[in-house]
């Protein structure tokens, strides 16, 4: 077995209150390995608002600023301005929000920060629903998902919002997807974002939630890997809003990923076929954008 090239240093304490198999805690661990100790983390209301611990306790070895649900982008912008006034250009400001605080409630503040091209790293750890408050659907929840607000036959009938494309349309220096199942790729992307210094860098991190997805905790990383291998969650980068690079190409059917999760148990073969068509369509668009950027 090949040993992964992952830094040994850790900036998380043992004993946090994340659920067993929580993808969001794995994501934070890898992110801080890349960013280092000169990092301040801005956290709005989300799962990580609880996992971080009540003041003055903390599960992280770096400073944390907790803020309101809708304000991660604005708070990170203000923190960056304060550090600049002090002449501190070395400290990295990282906003760390869930999909609810990014795709929905926080999108206005995020778009404002991005339009100003603030010198921050904004991370969405995406577990595809409002998990902290009881597994309610968000606009990051994929088509076909059963949640507490899309129960029974009322499962979600709309597609997932594409946040990377929305952020890329702002022409920011760097936007990328990452997954807890590919730690080396994820760490390299965070290191790249840290080195860039200047302008907004956005990372969309796929973070499984055993509780909300109705999966065994020990399957958390494997299912995250299946999402990439089936092109349900492709790994790619966008530079300056126009230059696309695909990091990994999937090869498995989407049903391999869907059928192992309780939140999709109600779907029929026809539903799986419909979802496969959606995945193929999105993958085709991504391939086209990548091809065009390579020719230009």
Language model features with spans:
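Basic/polar N-terminal segments that are highly enriched at the extreme N-terminus
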Residues: 1-4, 294-296
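Cofactor-binding active-site loop characterized by glycine-rich and histidine/acidic residues
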Residues: 2-122, 135, 139-143, 156, ...
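Conserved thiamine diphosphate
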Residues: 3-6, 15, 88-89, 138-192, ...
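Electropositive phosphate-/nucleotide-binding environments in soluble metabolic enzymes
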Residues: 9, 21-25, 69-73, 157, ...
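Structural signal for hydrophobic packing residues in well-ordered secondary-structure cores
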Residues: 32-39, 80-83, 158, 168-171, ...
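Short gly/pro/ser/thr-enriched loop/turn and capping motifs at secondary-structure boundaries
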Residues: 48-50, 127-132, 210-212
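Short, conserved beta-strand edge motifs with alternating hydrophobic and charged residues
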Residues: 124, 176-178, 202-206
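Glycine/aspartate-rich loop-and-adjacent alpha/beta segment that forms the canonical ThDP
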Residues: 186-296
């Amino acid at each position: 077995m090949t040993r992964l090239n992952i830094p040994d240093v850790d900036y998380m304490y043992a004993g946090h209150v994340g659920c067993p198999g929580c993808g969001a805690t794995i994501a934070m661990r890898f992110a801080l390995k890349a960013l280092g100790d000169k990092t301040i983390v801005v956290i709005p209301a989300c799962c990580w608002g609880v996992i971080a611990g009540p003041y003055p306790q903390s599960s992280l070895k770096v400073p944390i600023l907790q803020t309101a649900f809708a304000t991660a982008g604005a708070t990170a912008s203000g923190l960056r301005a304060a550090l600049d006034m002090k002449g501190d250009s070395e400290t990295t400001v990282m906003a760390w929000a869930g999909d609810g605080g990014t795709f929905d409630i926080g999108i206005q503040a995020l778009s404002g920060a991005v339009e100003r091209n603030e010198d921050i790293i904004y991370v969405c750890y995406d577990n595809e629903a409002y998990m902290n408050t009881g597994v309610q659907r968000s606009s990051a929840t994929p088509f076909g998902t059963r949640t507490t607000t899309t129960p029974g036959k009322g499962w979600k009938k709309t597609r997932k919002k594409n946040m990377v494309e929305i952020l890329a349309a702002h022409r920011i220096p760097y936007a990328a997807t990452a997954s807890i199942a590919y730690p080396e790729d994820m760490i390299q992307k965070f290191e790249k974002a840290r080195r860039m210094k200047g302008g907004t860098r956005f990372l969309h991190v796929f973070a499984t939630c055993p509780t909300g997805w109705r999966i065994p905790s020990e399957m958390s990383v494997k299912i995250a890997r299946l999402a990439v291998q089936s092109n349900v969650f492709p790994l790619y980068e966008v530079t300056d809003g126009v230059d696309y690079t695909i990091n990994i190409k999937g090869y498995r059917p989407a049903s391999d990923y869907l059928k192992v999760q309780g939140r999709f148990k109600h779907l029929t073969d026809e539903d799986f076929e419909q979802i496969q068509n959606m995945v193929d369509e999105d993958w085709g668009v991504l391939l086209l954008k990548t091809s065009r950027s390579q020719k230009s």
